[in-house]
Every structure is written in C-alpha cells, then in structure tokens.
From Swiss-Prot:
Forms part of the ribosomal stalk which helps the ribosome interact with GTP-bound translation factors. Gene3D superfamilies: Ribosomal protein L11, C-terminal domain, Ribosomal protein L11/L12, N-terminal domain. This is Large ribosomal subunit protein uL11. Part of the ribosomal stalk of the 50S ribosomal subunit. Interacts with L10 and the large rRNA to form the base of the stalk. L10 forms an elongated spine to which L12 dimers bind in a sequential fashion forming a multimeric L10(L12)X complex. InterPro entries: Ribosomal_uL11, Ribosomal_uL11_bac-typ, Ribosomal_uL11_C, Ribosomal_uL11_C_sf, Ribosomal_uL11_CS, Ribosomal_uL11_N, Ribosomal_uL11_N_sf. Keywords: Methylation, Ribonucleoprotein, Ribosomal protein, RNA-binding, rRNA-binding. The keyword DNA-binding does not apply. GO terms for biological process: translation. Belongs to the universal ribosomal protein uL11 family. GO terms for molecular function: large ribosomal subunit rRNA binding; structural constituent of ribosome. It comes from the Bacteria. One or more lysine residues are methylated. It comes from Staphylococcus aureus (strain COL). GO terms for cellular component: cytosolic large ribosomal subunit.
Amino acid sequence: MAKKVDKVVKLQIPAGKANPAPPVGPALGQAGVNIMGFCKEFNARTQDQAGLIIPVEISVYEDRSFTFITKTPPAPVLLKKAAGIEKGSGEPNKTKVATVTKNQVREIANSKMQDLNAADEEAAMRIIEGTARSMGIVVE
C-alpha cells in the first residue's frame, strides 16, 4: 500500500545553500522531517544551479519520511539574470531598467515550460514577456 501524505511544504531556497537555519528549519521541523537529511539531499541535487532560487515541494508522509520535487527557478529570477540586473523597476510603467532579446525570452520560456500553464512555446513566451513588462524590462 502506498504511504499516505501527511503534509506538503513549499519553499523557495537558494540552490546548494539549504541549511537548518530559518526559513528551512522551522518549516520542516513543524512537519517532523529530518532537517539535515533534507538539506544534504537538496544541496546535492541543486549544486549545479548555484546562484538561482529553486522552488521545492516537499511531501511529508505519516511515517515522517519525505520526498521532494525541485521546480525551475521563478521567471523574475531568470529574467534578472538574463538582463544582468539586481532588481526590477520600482515603477515599471515609467522607468525601464533593462532590455532582453526575444531569444533570451525563448530560452527562459523553454526552460520553464514544464512549470508554466502554456500549451506551446508562443504562449509560454507571452507569459514570460508579461512578467518582464511588470518588472520594467523591455523585450526586443
């Protein structure tokens, strides 16, 4: 018989940098997960994506064992990296902070395709372009 899921914990953690300090420790401690076991496994699985924030969904079972799924980094993180900026515009309608090319948007859309609610590449690109627009990034 399959194990019964007790809780699902969603976190966003920098790749390769999970440690028992907040916010990871308290969130997993409440769920009764072996915190160090999770940190070691997460860091090993994400060490090649250093510098990016990785969303993770941890399924905690009744016997306190766990499995987790890592997702692709959030679109704004990928857009900031592509544009080479620290943060988006405070006033995206008035102040534009950077530009990205259609090819960069296409790459981001393809890498995020599995997590986006889009039927094809064009729809995924429109989602990413909308995110860029709301951050004050111009798409050329």
